[in-house]
C-alpha cells in the first residue's frame, strides 16, 4: 500500500542528506492512491537529479508500485515479480438500495443547482458526474503512461501497447523494457555503488525499518474506523463483498486509484 506522507518524506530526507551518495528503493506494493503515487513520483524525480536511484522490486511492484519505480536510474526485478499493471480506476459506490433493503433507511434531498450534493453515494451518479469521473481517470492514466515513457525512455506508443492494466512477470517486464535486469536487493546495492562511483569504504543505512506487530495494528485502524461507521463488507452484494474483502486498500482510499486488479497467485 502506498502512503505519500511516509515514503515521500523519507525520499526527501535521503535527497537532502549529503552523506547519502545513492538510494536503493525496495518496492513491494500492488499500488494504492493515484495522488500518493504522484507525490512519491515527484520526490523520486527530485532525488534522481541529485544522486543515483535504484529500484529493487519484491513480489509486487504493480500499478502505483510501478508508477513510483519508473523514474529510477536502474530497475531490478525477480523473475516472478508481478509488475506493470499500468492503469487506473475509480470507485464510487451507490448505497441507496443497499441501505433501503438491508437497513430500511431511505433519503430525500433538495438541491439548489444540478451540481449541489455532487458525488453523493446515496443516489446514482448523474450523467455529468459520470463524465467528470471518467475525465479524471483519463487524465491520471495519461499522466501515468507519460511518466513511464519518460522514465524508461520508451516511445509513448510502445508504452500504450503494454499498458491498459496488463500485468507482467519480471522476466516479461525485462523483455518489455519495464525493468533493466533480473536480480535482487544485493545486485541493486551493487549497482548503486557502481553508479555513485563509491571507491572508499561505505555503510548501508535503512531509512524504513519493518513495522512491528503493534505498528501494523495501528496501520490497520483506518479500516477499523471505516467499519465502526457501519460500512462493513457484509452490507454489500456478494460480488462487491468479495472484491472488497480481498482488497481493503479500496475501502481506505478515496478517488482515483492506481492499483493492481484483484489478487493474483502463481502456481509452480
Residue spans of the language-model regions?
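Short flexible/disordered coil segments
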Residues: 39, 82-95, 116-125, 218-231
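Short, solvent-exposed coil/turn elements at secondary-structure transition points
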Residues: 59, 81, 113, 165, ...
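A mature extracytoplasmic/lumenal domain signature
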Residues: 27-31, 59, 180, 185, ...
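Charged, glycine-interspersed solvent-exposed loop segments at helix/strand-loop junctions
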Residues: 96-195, 199
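Short glycine/threonine-rich loop-to-helix capping motif typified by GTGT followed
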Residues: 34-39, 172-175, 217-221
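Cleft-lining beta-strand/loop regions that shape enzyme active-site pockets
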Residues: 1-98
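Intrinsically disordered, low-complexity segments enriched in small/flexible residues
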Residues: 1-12, 19, 26, 105, ...
Amino acid at each position: 500500500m502506498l502512503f505519500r506522507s511516509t515514503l515521500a518524506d523519507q525520499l526527501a530526507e535521503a535527497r537532502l542528506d549529503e552523506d547519502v551518495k545513492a538510494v536503493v528503493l525496495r518496492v513491494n506494493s500492488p499500488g494504492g492512491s493515484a495522488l500518493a503515487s504522484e507525490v512519491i513520483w515527484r520526490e523520486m524525480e527530485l532525488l534522481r537529479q541529485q544522486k543515483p536511484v535504484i529500484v529493487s522490486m519484491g513480489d509486487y511492484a504493480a500499478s502505483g508500485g510501478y508508477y513510483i519505480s519508473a523514474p529510477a536510474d536502474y530497475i531490478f526485478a525477480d523473475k516472478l515479480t508481478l509488475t506493470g499493471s499500468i492503469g487506473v480506476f475509480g470507485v464510487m459506490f451507490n448505497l441507496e438500495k443497499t441501505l433501503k433493503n438491508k437497513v430500511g433507511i431511505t433519503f430525500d434531498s433538495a438541491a439548489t443547482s444540478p451540481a449541489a450534493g455532487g458525488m453523493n453515494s446515496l443516489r446514482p451518479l448523474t450523467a455529468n458526474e459520470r463524465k467528470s469521473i471518467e475525465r479524471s481517470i483519463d487524465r491520471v492514466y495519461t499522466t501515468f503512461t507519460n511518466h513511464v515513457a519518460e522514465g524508461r525512455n520508451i516511445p509513448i506508443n510502445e508504452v500504450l501497447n503494454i499498458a491498459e492494466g496488463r500485468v507482467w512477470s519480471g522476466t516479461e517486464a525485462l523483455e518489455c523494457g519495464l525493468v533493466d535486469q533480473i536480480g535482487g536487493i544485493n545486485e541493486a546495492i551493487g549497482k548503486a555503488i557502481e553508479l555513485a562511483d563509491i571507491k572508499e569504504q561505505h555503510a548501508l543505512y535503512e531509512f524504513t525499518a519493518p513495522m512491528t506487530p503493534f505498528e501494523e495494528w495501528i496501520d490497520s485502524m483506518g479500516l477499523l474506523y471505516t467499519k465502526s461507521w457501519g460500512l462493513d463488507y457484509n452490507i454489500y452484494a456478494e460480488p462487491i463483498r468479495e472484491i472488497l474483502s480481498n482488497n481493503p486498500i479500496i475501502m481506505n482510499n478515496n478517488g482515483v486509484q492506481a492499483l493492481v486488479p484483484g489478487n493474483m497467485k502463481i502456481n509452480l
